[in-house]
Amino acid sequence: ADCLWGGGRVGFGDHDSAEILALLREYGISARLTFSNSLLREEHLSDRKCNDLCALFEEGGDQRNGVIVHSDLLLAYLKQQYPGFYFVSSTTKVLTDFEDLRGEIDREDFRYVVPDFRLNKAFAQWDTLTGWQRDKVEFLCNECCFFGCRDRKQCYEAVSRKNLGEPGEHRCKAPGAAGGYRFSKAMKNPGFIGVEAVRDTYLPLGFSDFKIEGRGLGSALLLEFLLHYMTKPEYHLALREELYLENTLDLF
């Protein structure tokens, strides 16, 4: 959180990075640093906080850790300075043209590529990919943004400027933007991929990697994501009760 190289959203937090890494190692989970700022310049590469995080997370133990990246400048720097990482091409690139996306998938730099969510249902095009290309695709499942938005790239660039401490606020003009994120709204989005679609459509097509957005939305929404995507329906109520009755958990 609060990193110069960050993008996608502005985040703040005070959790201990070493403790987070230790927890992920305990459960065998690959960590990813989200460094998707699209407007980085040469002078930003020496940022101490971001480099310290890279030095810490590059040593992933049994699980290799990764970096989600937008800037090719940062990508080249990270490949040279921290070769232990794998790299993920960020959805903040807003690649809505399928041939542009195909070119991104074909780049050897990336283990995974996250398409713009508006390509999620482009099944005729997805069917043209080879097996190894499908292995590199990671779908963003639960985007809530307006499907017809034309300013998505500008919105991400505004976040990048904010992380750099530069002016240039973006005011979203999309329908319903003032209401903020709602999972119920995301489920009605034409690009939404629910757990049934993962199981019945995408897995049979050879796609096995999926991304859930919303890490900064608060525990209550994160709980709903985890219930929908990672918990069998018959356990939903029992899990909710356990968490609601845990008075040390800040859900709201």
Model-predicted segments: where are they?
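Active-site pocket-lining/capping segments in soluble small-molecule metabolic enzymes
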Residues: A1-D100, E104, F110-F252
